[in-house]
Regions:
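Bacterial N-terminal signal peptides
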Residues: 2-10
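Sec-dependent signal peptide cleavage junction
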Residues: 11-26
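Short, surface-exposed binding/anchoring microloops in extracellular/periplasmic proteins
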Residues: 31-84
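Short, non-transmembrane alpha-helical segments in secretory-pathway proteins
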Residues: 68-77, 81-89, 137-179
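Short, aromatic- and glycine-rich surface loops/edge beta-strands on solvent-exposed regions
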Residues: 84, 115-129
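Aromatic sugar-binding surface patches on proteins
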Residues: 93-109
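Exposed beta-strand-loop-beta-strand "reactive/processing" segments of non-cytosolic proteins
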Residues: 108-115, 167-202, 213
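Edge beta-strands of extracellular beta-sandwich domains
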Residues: 129-140, 212-213
Length: 215
């Protein structure tokens, strides 16, 4: 009886897998689902809710992702020591920020979830200055969720997604980032294993494609 069960299972498993609805969101290897910002005098702060694969490689292969909070701080110079502290869900986070000479900004990353926050009070110690800033989300009431945004792109670029789908699987990985230039937008990158990328800029409220390019 057990042997008969195994034979039946081996027969039906491919059929079950073939009829399972493909979820393209499963192939998102980098997700920036929230962005909180504040600008004050000579200082600017950006806080990202990020889920990112490790190792972080644009090779068309989706790996396991981890949830992070990434903080970027811009100051008049990078000559001062800099640290950050903040609280999420009653838990305190913080530490020294490293300085990126190329991007000319300080950086801090920690395992914390700010994806659903609308505001985040942050304390920055920059040299002898103590800055108390409150970063606000760039999302609006009508901003699409990342999943809804990807569904909208799939509907608008159905031919492209069909080309990148084989045997009920997406043949690549997806970058999906909430960004802001005066208004919120989404960036989506479709990366295939042959190193090609299809990049899209979309409105955050409707998912309308504003620009696209291939490289």
């Amino acid at each position: 009886m057990f042997l008969l069960f195994l034979v039946a299972l081996s027969f039906f498993s491919p059929l079950i897998q073939a009829t399972k609805k493909l979820d393209y969101f499963d192939y998102v290897s980098e997700l920036r689902s929230n962005l909180l910002t504040v600008n004050e005098k000579d200082y600017s702060l950006r806080v990202y809710a990020v889920e990112k694969e490790y190792p972080y490689v644009a090779d068309g292969i989706k790996r396991e992702t981890t949830l992070r909070t990434e903080i970027y701080f811009t100051a008049p110079t990078g000559d001062e020591s800099c640290s950050v502290t903040f609280t999420v869900d009653g838990k305190n986070y913080g530490g020294e920020m490293s300085y990126d000479n190329v991007k000319a900004e300080y950086f801090y990353s920690v395992s914390a979830d700010v994806s659903k926050l609308e505001r985040l009070p942050v304390e920055i110690v920059y040299g002898k200055d103590v800055l108390r800033l409150t970063a606000l989300t760039v999302k609006k009431a009508n901003t699409l969720s990342p999943r809804a945004l990807l569904d909208a792109l799939k509907d608008n670029e159905r031919e492209t997604f069909n080309q990148l789908t084989e045997d009920n699987a997406f043949v690549g990985e997806i970058y999906l980032r909430l960004i802001c230039e005066d208004e919120p937008y989404y960036y989506v990158g479709l990366i295939t294993k042959d190193g090609k990328m299809r990049a899209y800029l979309l409105t955050a409220d409707t998912g309308k494609v504003l620009a696209k390019r291939e490289s």
